[in-house]
């Protein structure tokens, strides 16, 4: 199995984005960030601590592990269980599974007088055979959790993250599927062995099913059209501070803000500080404003 996977990747096709484009992973990103990205403004240069690099690679390895497990089950499930495996990866004409480099594509969108592409790849497009023989195409999105074992508990994780749902909506349009599974895999553990009943409260994997309708896709595409209009017209949209931590264009944004926009951000941060939102959200908003103020004063950040 591993040798076959390595052979596939050794001959993986090269697919490059057709501009203008949006990535499914940016479906919920700050519109101001996407504006500066489209203009080709420089990304922030940040020093990533070694531990962040390790965490990122662990997240990638988790996705690879799940995909390998699914391929292994395709091959051996029936022999071990005594009935056909109900699911398998959809295959390309050359026999490669429909995931990662073998599913990467540019999907053209013409909407609202604008033309752009959705560019990227998915964690998998599966074929699920129901008990009555119906074949359903189901998308798969794998997400890792690493901060604590409780992140995938039934108490903490009651529904999938909204940004992950929107990412799947973009994939639904790209691959023509209306069913999706978001699988959360937790790399943290409370202990090597659990007391009876403890694991059931905080399992290391959680799966959520989505049924994606045309209206969900229309809402997302309309958002991309709005952002593309702002890019073409040179009129950037407001900053969304909710995703500031992972915003790659903080400096460009800070420098492009008008005085009125800066004042609006100050007011927003002030209101958030007085609200009853999580302390982590308050810190993120306050940190964003502090960064912006320093950049505009010419101070090193």
Predicted regions and their residues:
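Metal-dependent nuclease catalytic cores that hydrolyze phosphodiester bonds in DNA/RNA
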Residues: 1-139, 146, 282-301
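Metal-dependent nuclease catalytic regions and adjoining charged, substrate-binding loops involved
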Residues: 177-301
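Short linear functional motifs in flexible/disordered or boundary regions
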Residues: 42, 74, 78, 151-152, ...
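Generic structural signal for alpha-helix starts
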Residues: 23, 49, 161, 270, ...
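Mg2+/Mn2+-dependent nuclease catalytic core
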Residues: 95-229
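Intrinsically disordered, low-complexity segments enriched in small/polar residues
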Residues: 6-7, 19, 33, 169, ...
């Amino acid at each position: 199995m591993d040798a076959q996977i390595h052979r596939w990747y050794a001959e993986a096709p090269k697919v490059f984005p057709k501009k203008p484009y949006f990535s499914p992973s940016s479906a919920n990103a700050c519109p101001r960030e996407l504006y500066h990205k489209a203009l080709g403004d420089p990304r922030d240069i940040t020093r990533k601590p070694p531990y962040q690099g390790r965490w990122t690679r662990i997240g990638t390895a988790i996705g690879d592990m799940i995909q390998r497990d699914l391929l292994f089950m395709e091959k051996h499930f029936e022999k071990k269980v005594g009935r056909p495996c109900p699911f398998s990866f959809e295959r390309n004409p050359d026999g490669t599974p429909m995931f990662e480099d073998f599913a990467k594509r540019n999907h053209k969108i013409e909407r609202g007088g604008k033309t752009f592409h959705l560019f990227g790849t998915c964690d998998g497009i599966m074929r699920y055979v129901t008990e009555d023989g119906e074949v359903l195409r189901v998308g798969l999105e794998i997400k890792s959790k690493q901060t604590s074992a409780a992140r995938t508990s039934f108490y903490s994780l009651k529904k999938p993250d909204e940004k992950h749902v929107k990412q799947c909506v973009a994939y639904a349009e790209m691959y023509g599927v209306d069913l999706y599974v978001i699988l959360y895999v937790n790399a943290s553990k409370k202990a090597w062995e659990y007391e009876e009943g403890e694991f059931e409260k905080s399992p290391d994997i959680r799966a959520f099913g989505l049924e994606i309708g045309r209206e969900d896709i229309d809402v997302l595409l309309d958002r991309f059209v709005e952002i593309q209009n702002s890019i073409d017209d040179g009129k950037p949209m407001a900053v969304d501070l909710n995703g500031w931590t992972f915003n790659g264009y903080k400096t460009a944004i800070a420098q492009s803000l008008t005085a009125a926009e800066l004042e609006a951000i100050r007011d927003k941060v002030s209101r958030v500080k007085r609200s009853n939102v999580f302390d982590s959200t308050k810190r993120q908003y306050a940190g964003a404003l502090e960064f912006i103020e320093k950049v505009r004063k010419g101070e090193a950040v």
